[in-house]
Amino acid sequence: MRVASVLLAAGGGTRYRASLDAAKSGVPKTHKLLAVGADGRSVVEHAFAAMAAGSGDGPLIVVSGAVELPELPNATQLHNPKWAEGQSTSLWTAIDLAVRLNCEAVVVGLGDQPRIAPGDWTALRNAMTLGASIGVATYDGRRRNPVGLARSVWPLLPSNSDEGARSVMRAHPSLVTEVPCTGNSDDIDSVEDLLQWHLS
């Protein structure tokens, strides 16, 4: 089964920018996806590395929007000019490519979640291979990312909202398979989040 791994990294980082403007910590004023960790790699590079390590031999797709991303090895990098219209536009940018690549499912994560583990990506990929319609990672019982979407549910996805797959999961709970994961799904939404990530 051909499963594409997708990293959505197109948002404007509005909450982080507000936090950055208010901070007095000397943190460089850059987009959160480009903020650098203790090892010199950016937030999005960490998120991508985990995805790549946990994705087997499937295609790697990265969708950018508000900011130009660094080159990411072995990835097809797409720009979504409609990124400001909501996360679903970025998801559809990736799915359009997945259709052309004859993929039967996608596993989708976010570029501002650098602590998701490679094993979490693998677990979602395995769930899709075993026939899940929608797979969702859970951390201590909470549904978070990554999320797996079989080709059969793609027509149900919204085209221009910020909900991604959440509305489909609410409308079709019987299609959802929860996949327990062990990483950390916290995102970087503030300077405090960034500094905490530096310490983790």
Q: What function would you assign to each model-found segment?
A:
Residues 1-6, 16-17, 53, 74, ...:
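SAM-dependent methyltransferases
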Residues 63-69, 173:
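Short, polar loop motifs at secondary-structure junctions
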Residues 1-64:
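N-terminal glycine-rich phosphate-binding loop and ensuing alpha1 helix
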Residues 76, 84-151, 155-157:
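Conserved beta-loop-beta/alpha segment of the NTase-like Rossmann-fold superfamily
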Residues 25-38, 42, 78-89, 115, ...:
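Residues at secondary-structure transition points
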